[in-house]
Swiss-Prot record:
Entry similarity comment: Belongs to the ssRNA positive-strand viruses RNA-directed RNA polymerase family.
Segments forming domain RdRp catalytic: 1374-1487
Organism the protein comes from: Tobacco mild green mosaic virus (TMGMV)
Quaternary context: Heterodimer of a large and a small subunit. Both large and small subunits interact, via an ATP bridge, with host protein Tm-1 (e.g. tomato Tm-1 AC A7M6E7 and AC A7M6E8).
UniProt-annotated stretches for the region Helicase: 828-1080
Additional record remark: This protein is translated as a fusion protein by episodic readthrough of a termination codon. When readthrough of the terminator codon TGA occurs between the codons for Arg-1111 and Gln-1113, this results in the addition of the RdRp region to the replicase.
Region (Methyltransferase) location: 50-453
Matching Pfam families: RdRP_2, ToMV_Hel_N, Viral_helicase1, Vmethyltransf
Entry keywords, A to Z: ATP-binding, Helicase, Host-virus interaction, Hydrolase, Inhibition of host innate immune response by virus, Nucleotide-binding, Nucleotidyltransferase, RNA suppression of termination, RNA-directed RNA polymerase, Suppressor of RNA silencing, Transferase, Viral immunoevasion, Viral RNA replication
Residue span(s) of domain (+)RNA virus helicase ATP-binding: 799-958
Biological process, per Gene Ontology: DNA-templated transcription; mRNA modification; RNA processing; symbiont-mediated suppression of host innate immune response; viral RNA genome replication
Binding site for ATP: G834, C835, G836, K837, Y838, K839, R866, L962, R963, R1071, D1092, L1093, S1094, S1095
Enzyme Commission designation: 2.1.1.-, 2.7.7.-, 2.7.7.48, 3.6.4.13
Protein name from the UniProt record: Replicase large subunit
Length: 1609
């Protein structure tokens, strides 16, 4: 396997280094995916906090030793033996990691506080007080619990849920948590049925006598015991002192006593028995009974700590008991000959231990003893004339090197001095060619002399042995032993008698006549032996009392459980509730019961208030006869209008202009017929339902009223927009906007060409300037007009009379404006797609008595076709109808049963009307709660939340689909609760295809199979123009079934309705029975869904899975007004620190090689989806220019090199920017809605309305313009003076160019995307000079806003931003909201222009100048002279316009003001498209995404965050104020810029960065909150304090900053 993995890695590296770009990209992607998987796996490791202060080397040591944990080193606590103390927590977690979670566990000598903090309620700690140190340690554990509880109390918190059981157990039965008995004497036993039992021993094993260990384990029925002990292998080899350098500890042995202590520390020593330690090391079997033994197995060695486990073994399974284990007889008798009891015991152990019979195991567990030998040393005493012997451990190669060398000496040269000289020479360092080379063997110099004597004696004896063997052997008259002694005497000379005694005594030479007799008398005793500490009384260690804290926590939990039944309990302020209970000294449980009783009206106290929603206001108002008449009343700006005054007066305020309407009040004058609608004044249609009305009656009646009003509002919006199209006399062109058409009666041509023809009605403008509605008729294809008609406006909403006819018929069913509530029984059939509505119910409907209603004509035709397939005509136009058909042409007939298909797509009031009109006894409403619901497309009309739920009597669930194939059915499992089954025999049906653009599709060259479906109406019209027939949108075919479906997406703009959770995607995927193919121009979530479904294995297609994600509420730290202290940031680190931090936050970006991307794009074939434009291909090849080399950055970031402008580069930028604008807007009455939005804008952001109404006249005047001109530069005035003003300037013509430097994104998109350049669309200098004064004056006017609550970031310094956010109250919990809008400038359309135009008008802008500005932002022409491109754009914000910045700021403020309750905002800041808002926590916000899509055409996402992010800066709060940090990651990205021309340019960059990032030089907070804020945005971010220090270091030093860039590239 290792060989295969090596081959794969080598092949992958070869692929990366190859020349094939595609293979390189795939290989890099594979390496990236592998790295991501590895990092994700690391993040899943258990997390451990290491608070002790240790060195960097020790940090690396700990990290490498414990790879199972994700360790965070805080270095915040100085302590004695910091490394060993911190390792103790890691060692405990490692031991507990081996134990199955929840299994009963004994911790021998353990830390019960550590287990309480981890919530382990299954651990019992045996904590005997064997010495004073144990008592001290146990008191410290109780102190840690006290500190923890006091910290919770100080912060008004309770014990967390995961710790409650453990703390309850300690409070109720402390002896079950810990006892003062030894493990052998412990009497605590878990329940018998609690499963296997375990034990852990952390540095406590040596305190248990070895002969008691097995019996103690079996008495607790321990299955496995895991132990960790500190051990030095040299201690087993008669060493009297051994140092453990890694943890700074020392073992010291004196006889059988072993002391353990830490160097240079005054802490008490640990004492153990040497024999006990030795037994635990050398024994493998620990007998527990005649049958059971515990077998020891070493696990791992980490930082001087040995881990092992003792496993319970039943020896009867091996057919032998422990007593039958025999001993090695040779070792046994050899041991008996030795008089030392210690050696005899050791020999007995050698017969049992299995580990030392395996050389590999010995080398593994004793790595330092590998290739080491024990050599005796001889030392003589001058005074006593005696010689002593000791032993030393040296390297085996060293010994044989010395012996082999000196064995070559001649007899005369073999002296002690020569041997010592050679040993010293090979031990010393050697200098070779001026370089010092260290000796291979590290032998202590102190033992070289006695060691040389040993080598000398061994060589002498070996030489003597050789002489005896090789010499001629003669006995003569001496015995053999005498001859040998003679030879030995000749060899050693005069020292022979002493040497003889020593050799015989040490068994180097042995004779039979001398017997070994050793007697060791007790010569002395030590002072320690005389010191005896006796205890006269035994005391139990008292337990810590935590009952009070647990009682408080229990009471709070009970109180919150009681309060959870209240409506809106998720918004309950727990902190205020706790403060109230504490201030009033009342039990939380009692207070909660009182609150619930009051809320449920069980206390005798009636609440006179409720949340003023539409639902509650409707309940509070009484129904009176006067409410049937709703009138319109013009209101002045001084009158405060609210929904309560509207309901009381029965009048509606006129929000828009009256268009000449003089009556103060208009009674209900509904149009009785279509004839009344013909030539009706537009004012009578527009001024209907322009404000939110509080409805009365039952909920069904309220829904029906709302539906009628929504039809009127839709008609009003359509007529209003048509009137606006007729008033826009400038800019008509035949290249229309598709939705609206304007016919010029005089010229007999379309000024704006509509997408379709044959409109039923429209709005007419006559020569007198009056506008009225008209019913249209045709003679052939020509529209019939009258002589006084000037223009006719139509739209896609005027094709039929639907809304008009519906209003007419529904009002006829109402009596005095009150609809009748339907009395029929209503049953909701909630079924999955294809659940068999037709097969199960529709096939059994009665021809004469039942009625089936469907949304569209296609569905009605399908049902009729199926019902009549047998030849018998059962379904007709009378009993199978569309919803619109029944509402527009009701027939006076009652039905027994009513079937409404896709009823949840309809307005709830519409469903109620259908039931009422049909006169049925029971109504079955078929729908799918997961598919597309009813969408309110009239954005200026309210559709309250409580109206969305259909009121039914029964709900029937259906979870079996007869339509969907197996792969689609698998997709449905994640959408519905419960199992979704299918009866389809088709397993695989979905596929996708990428197309190069809409130009690829043609009905002849590329026919599409089956039903053709699109997501948007724009794509539908595009396909119809290309010749495709029978095309519908997804919304239109909901509820229908087809064998084959072709789904087409031609819009490259991101669509919010295409997502994994979108109901549109669900509907699109569930319309087919056989095949489904998706044609798309971009990769989107639906492509990913299809890819995932295609890769499923066959057996998975029959499985189901339902998962629900958890929601978390983000909270933000509170602050209060104050000031920031200044503490200089340390200047440390180097550029590798910056590179490391950048790679961690944005992994893979630094590996992108983008130097030749622009060249590659020019050389390769490109498929571009281009809108209408004119291209000059003569400029496709740019002129070669000499480019001066730029400075090369040392840091590798995603920064792109500068690009040269050209046809291709500019065209790509224009396609991705200007041609990629979203089209999401629904039906809007533009002028009326803009007026309402601007009203909210001024009401929300300005202190008083009078402030900007009274000062307008004195601002936009000639004098004010002259004052502005006095402050302008002479160059601008000269340009204006020389300009020819005989005619209006070309206000609608703009120039186009691109920025040479692409904008860096702080994401990973650079790895798979060619970033488009930013476009600049700008006016001429003369036009900018004219409009510059207007922009400046409007900026001054906007200073009238409420500066305490809102900040418009115009000419503000970072210090002013910081000051603005410094007064937030730290005691008020807040939600930080950030609206992220993509393509902000390009999304702005006619509605945005109307809003901005209305704001400028109210600020006093001259009418003529305002009209000039408006025409300059409507239909505009763009010319790019460098690239040779010309195109036309409708609206869109121009990036080079003088009003761009102030206009964008105003639009984002108006947008948020129209969607969010700005009266409740705490703080808000706006700058261009950036915004950040602070609201009180717990507010209910509307559907921001839907409103932003349908009203503002914004692809927006609303984020709730903990920290604010505004204009590239993090807003960090603390208890003394706020600090605004420039985004460090953005700053580091700029340090990798590749467009720096020279060092002067580089210095300008440094000064600029110093100005914006000055706050990084203040270290008063130490950057922890900044790290948390960055982590909130970049999930892979780590603690970046080291990088921030490094940034500050480089920015503060001009010359050091230069080292980040190299001269030349």
């Amino acid at each position: 396997m290792a060989h295969i993995q090596s081959i794969i890695s080598n092949a992958l590296l070869e692929s990366v280094s190859g020349k094939n770009t595609l293979v390189n990209d795939l290989a890099r992607r594979r390496m990236y995916d592998t790295a991501v998987e590895e990092f994700n796996a690391r993040d899943r490791r258990p997390k451990v906090n290491f608070s002790k202060t240790i060195s960097e080397e020790q940090t690396l040591l700990v990290s490498n030793a414990y790879p199972e944990f994700q360790i965070t080193f805080y270095n915040t606590q100085n302590a004695v033996h910091s490394l060993a103390g911190g390792l103790r927590a890691l060692e405990l977690e490692y031991l507990m990691l081996q134990v199955p979670y929840g299994s009963p566990t004994y911790d021998i000598g353990g830390n019960f506080a550590a287990h309480l903090f981890k919530g382990r309620d299954y651990v019992h700690c045996c904590m005997p007080n064997l010495d004073i140190r144990d008592i001290m340690r146990h008191e410290g554990q109780k102190d840690s619990i006290e500190m923890y509880l006091s910290r919770l109390s100080r912060s008004n918190k309770v014990i967390p849920e995961f710790q409650r059981e453990a703390f309850n157990r300690y409070a109720e039965a402390p002896n079950e948590v810990c006892c003062s008995k030894t493990f052998q004497d412990c009497r605590i036993h878990p329940p018998e049925n609690s499963g296997r039992r375990y034990a852990v021993a952390l540095h406590s094993l040596y305190d248990i006598p070895v002969h008691e260990f097995g019996a103690a384990l079996i008495s607790k029925n321990i299955h496995v015991c895991y132990a960790a002990s500190i051990l030095a292998e040299a201690l087993l080899l008669d060493q009297t002192e051994v140092t453990l350098n890694e943890i700074g500890a020392t073992f010291k042995r004196e006889g059988d006593d072993v002391s353990f202590f830490f160097a240079d520390e005054s802490t008490l020593n640990y004492s153990h028995k040497y024999k006990n330690i030795l037994h635990y090391v050398v024994k493998s079997y620990f007998p527990a009974s005649s049958r059971i033994v515990y077998f020891k197995e070493f696990l791992v060695t980490r930082v001087n700590t040995w881990f092992c486990k003792f496993t319970k073994v039943d020896t009867y399974i091996l057919y032998k008991s422990v007593r039958q284990v025999g001993c090695d007889s040779d070792q046994f008798y050899e041991a008996m000959e030795d008089a030392f009891a210690y050696k005899k015991t050791l020999a007995m152990f050698n017969t049992e231990r299995a580990i030392f019979r395996d050389t590999a195991s010995v080398n593994f567990w004793f790595p330092k003893m590998k290739d080491m030998v024990i050599v005796p040393l001889f030392e003589g005493s001058i005074t006593s004339k005696k010689m002593t012997r000791s032993e030393v451990i040296v390297n085996r190669d060293f010994v044989y090197t010395v012996l082999n060398h000196i064995r070559t000496y001649q007899a005369k040269a073999l002296t002690y001095q020569n041997v010592l000289s050679f040993v010293e020479s090979i031990r010393s360092r050697v200098i070779i060619n001026g370089v010092t080379a260290r000796s291979e063997w590290d032998v202590d110099k102190a033992i070289l002399q006695p060691l040389s004597m040993t080598f000398f004696l061994q060589t002498k004896l070996a030489a003597l042995q050789d002489d005896i063997v090789m010499g001629k052997f003669r006995c003569l008259d001496k015995t053999t032993s005498e001859l040998i002694w003679d030879e030995v005497g000749k060899f050693f000379g005069n020292v022979f008698p002493t040497i003889k005694e020593r050799l015989v005594s040490r068994k180097i030479l042995d004779v039979s006549e001398n017997a070994l007799k050793i007697k060791i008398p007790d010569l002395y005793v030590t002072w320690k032996d005389r010191f005896v500490a006796e205890y006269t009384k035994s005391e139990e260690l008292p337990h810590l009392d935590i009952k009070k804290d647990l009682e408080e926590a229990e009471q709070m939990y009970d109180a919150l459980s009681e309060l959870s039944i209240l409506k809106g309990a998720d918004n309950f302020d727990i902190a205020k509730f706790k403060d109230m209970c504490k201030a009033l000294d009342v039990s939380p449980d009692v207070a909660a019961r009182v609150i619930v009783a009051v809320a449920e009206n069980r206390s005798g106290l009636t609440l006179t208030f409720d949340k003023p929603t539409e639902e509650n206001v409707a309940k509070a108002l009484k129904s009176t006869a006067s409410e049937a008449v709703v009138c319109l009343e013009p209101t002045s700006e001084e009158v405060n209008v609210n929904k309560f005054s509207i309901a009381e007066k029965g009048r509606l305020p006129v929000c828009a202009e009256s268009h000449g309407l003089t009556n103060a009040n208009l009674e209900h004058q509904e149009l009785e017929s279509l004839n009344d609608f013909h030539k009706a004044c537009v004012d009578s249609v527009i001024t209907k339902q322009m404000a939110s009305v509080v409805y009365t009656g039952s909920l069904k009646v309220q829904q029906m009223k709302n539906y009628v009003d929504s039809l009127a509002a839709s008609l009003s919006a359509t007529v209003s927009n048509l009137c606006k199209s007729l008033k826009d006399e400038v800019g008509y062109d035949s290249d229309s906007r598709e939705k609206v058409g304007v016919w010029d009666v005089t010229l007999k041509k379309w000024l704006l060409k509509p997408a379709a023809k044959g409109h039923s009605w429209g709005v007419v403008l006559d020569y007198k300037g009056k506008m009225f509605t008209a019913l249209l008729s045709y003679e052939g294809d020509r529209m019939v007009t009258e002589s006084d008609w000037r223009r006719v406006a139509v739209s896609s909403d005027t094709m039929v009379y639907s809304d008009i006819a519906k209003l007419q018929n529904l009002r006829k069913t109402m009596r005095d404006g009150e609809p009748h509530e339907p009395t029929a029984k209503m049953v909701l059939v909630d079924g999955v797609p294809g659940c068999g509505k037709y097969k199960g119910d529709f096939e059994r409907f009665d021809l004469d008595e039942d009625l089936i209603l469907v949304p569209g004509k296609q569905a009605a035709a399908m049902i009729r076709r199926r019902a009549n397939s047998s030849g018998l005509i059962r379904a007709t136009m009378d009993n199978v109808r569309t919803v619109d058909s029944l509402l527009m042409h009701p027939k006076p007939r009652s039905h027994k049963r009513l079937f409404i298909d896709e009823g949840l797509m309809l307005h709830t009031g519409c469903v109620n009307f259908l039931v009422l009109i049909s006169g049925c006894d029971i109504a079955y409403i078929y729908g799918d709660t997961q598919q597309i619901p009813f969408i309110n497309r009239v954005q200026n009309f309210p559709y309250p939340k409580h109206f969305e739920k259909l009121q039914v009597d029964e709900v029937e669930m259906r979870r079996t689909t007869l339509r969907c194939p197996g792969d689609v059915n698998f997709f449905l499992q994640s959408k519905y609760e419960g199992a979704v089954t299918t009866t389809s025999t088709v397993q695989r049906s979905v596929s996708s295809e990428m197309i190069g653009g809409k130009g690829v599709l043609n009905s002849v060259s590329k026919p599409l199979k089956g039903k053709i479906v699109t997501f948007t109406q724009a794509d539908k019209f595009e396909l119809e123009e290309k010749g495709y027939k029978n095309v519908n949108t997804v919304h239109e075919i909901q509820g229908e079934t087809f064998e084959d479906v072709s789904l087409v997406r031609l819009t490259a703009t991101p669509l919010t309705l295409i997502s994994k959770s979108s109901p549109h995607v669900l509907v699109a995927l569930t319309r087919h029975t056989k095949s489904f193919k998706y044609y798309t121009v971009v990769l989107d979530p639906l492509v990913q869904i299809i890819s995932d479904l295609s890769s499923l294995s066959s057996f998975l297609l029959e499985m189901y899975m339902v998962e629900a994600g958890s929601r978390x509420q983000l909270q933000m730290d509170a602050v209060f007004k104050g000031h920031n202290l200044f503490v200089a940031t340390p200047k440390s680190g180097d550029f590798p620190d910056l590179q490391f931090y950048y790679d961690v936050c944005l992994p893979g970006n630094s590996t992108i090689l983008n130097k030749y991307d622009a060249v590659t794009m020019r050389l390769r074939d490109n498929s571009l989806n281009v809108k209408d434009c004119v291209l000059d291909f003569s400029k496709s090849i740019p002129m070669p220019k000499e480019v001066k080399p730029c400075l090369e950055p040392v840091l590798r970031t995603a920064a792109e090199p500068p690009r040269a402008a050209g046809l291709l580069e500019n065209l790509v930028a224009m396609i991705k920017r200007n041609f990629n604008a979203p089209d999401l807007t629904g039906t809007i009455d533009i002028e009326s809605t803009a007026s309402v939005v601007v009203d909210k804008f001024f009401d929300s952001y300005f202190i008083k309305k009078e402030k900007y109404t009274k000062n307008i006249a004195g601002v936009m005047t000639k004098d004010s313009m002259m004052r502005w001109l006095e402050n302008r530069k002479e160059v601008l005035l000269d340009d204006l003076a020389n300009y020819n003003f005989t005619d209006l300037p070309a206000i609608d013509q703009y120039k186009h160019m691109i920025k040479a430097q692409p904008k860096q994104k702080l994401d990973l998109s650079i790895q798979n995307e060619y970033p488009a350049l930013q476009t600049i669309v700008y006016h001429s200098k003369q036009i900018n000079g004219i409009l510059a004064g207007f922009s400046e004056l409007t900026r001054l006017l906007l200073e009238a806003f409420d500066s305490k609550k809102f900040l418009f970031f115009t000419r503000k310094t970072p210090e002013q931003i910081q000051e603005f956010f410094s007064d937030l109250d730290s005691h008020v919990p807040m939600d930080v909201l950030e609206l992220d809008i993509s393509k902000y400038d390009k999304s702005q359309n006619e509605f945005h222009c109307a809003v901005e135009y209305e704001i400028w008008k109210r600020l006093g802008l001259n009418e003529f100048l305002a009209e000039v500005w408006k025409q300059g932002h409507r239909k505009t022409t763009l010319k790019d002279y460098i690239a040779g491109i010309k195109t036309c754009l409708w609206y869109q914000r121009k990036s080079g316009d003088v009003t761009t910045f102030i206009g964008n700021t105003v639009i984002i403020a108006a947008c948020l003001g129209s969607m969010l309750p700005m009266e409740k905002v705490i703080k808000g800041a706006f700058c261009g498209d950036d915004s950040v808002l602070y609201f009180p926590k717990g507010l209910d916000f509307p559907d921001i995404q839907s409103c932003a899509n349908l009203m503002w055409n914004f692809e927006a996402k609303l984020y709730r965050k903990r920290y604010g992010y505004f204009c590239g800066r993090y807003i960090i709060h603390h208890d003394k104020g706020a600090i605004v940090y420039y985004d460090p990651l953005k700053l580091i990205s700029k340090l990798g810029a590749k467009h720096i021309k020279d060092y002067d340019h580089l210095e300008e960059l440094r000064v600029s960065l110093c100005d914006v990032a000055c706050s990084l030089g203040n270290w008063c907070l130490g950057f922890p909150q900044l790290n948390a804020a960055i982590k909130e945005v970049h999930k892979t971010a780590i603690d970046g304090s080291f990088a921030f220090n490094c940034v500050n270091k480089f920015l503060c030093d001009k010359f050091l900053f230069r080292t980040l860039f190299l001269n030349g590239c």
